[in-house]
C-alpha cells in the first residue's frame, strides 16, 4: 500500500467510526473497508467478556451468522485467545502449517482456503486488552505480513478509541438520566 493509499485508508476508517454511534454498525463497516483495501478473505473483531472470561465474535466478514454465534474462545486458546491473553500481535504466513490454528468457525473448508495468511492484533484500552482484530488474506510470498500487522494495529487502536468514546457517551447519558430522576424526585417531594 502506497503512502497516499494508506492515508486514504485510515481517513476512510476514521470517517466511518466518527459517523456511527452504534458499535456493531461501525465495526461491520470497518471490516468492509479492510476487505476492499487489503484483499481480506475473512475478518473478525472479537471482544473479551470479562464477566464470563470468554471471547466472542462481535462482528465478522466472510463468516456465517450461525458460526459467529456458536464460536467462543477461552483466554489463551488458539491464536486469537493467545493474542488477547498476551497482548502481542501474531502473523501466520500459511494457516495450513500452523497447529495452533483452530478454525472454530469452520469457514475455511477447501484446500485452496488453506493457502491463507492470518494476521491477528490485540485491541487495547490503555494497557488492558479488550479484544482482537483478525484478518485472513490470500497467501503471497512477497507480501509483508509485518507491514499488514502495523496497519491493523493502527486500525485496532482506532477501534479501541471508538469503543472508549461510545462507553463514555453511554456513561454520561446514564449519569444524566440518574440526575434527572433525582431532580424529579426532589420536585415531587417539594410540591
Regions found by a protein language model. Give the residues of each.
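Regulatory loop-to-helix N-cap segments in sensory/regulatory domains
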Residues: 1-2, 136-153
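Acidic/proline- and glycine-rich, intrinsically disordered low-complexity segments
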Residues: 66-90
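Flexible nucleotide-interacting loop at or near the entrance of a catalytic core
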Residues: 164-191
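GAF sensory/regulatory domain recognition
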Residues: 44-71, 97
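Signal-transducing coupling segments at domain and membrane junctions
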Residues: 65-66, 93-117
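Signal-transmission linkers at sensory-effector interfaces
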Residues: 1-28, 36, 176-185
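Signal-transmission/dimerization alpha-helices at domain junctions
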Residues: 82-89, 126, 151-170
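A short, aliphatic-rich beta-strand micro-motif
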Residues: 116-124
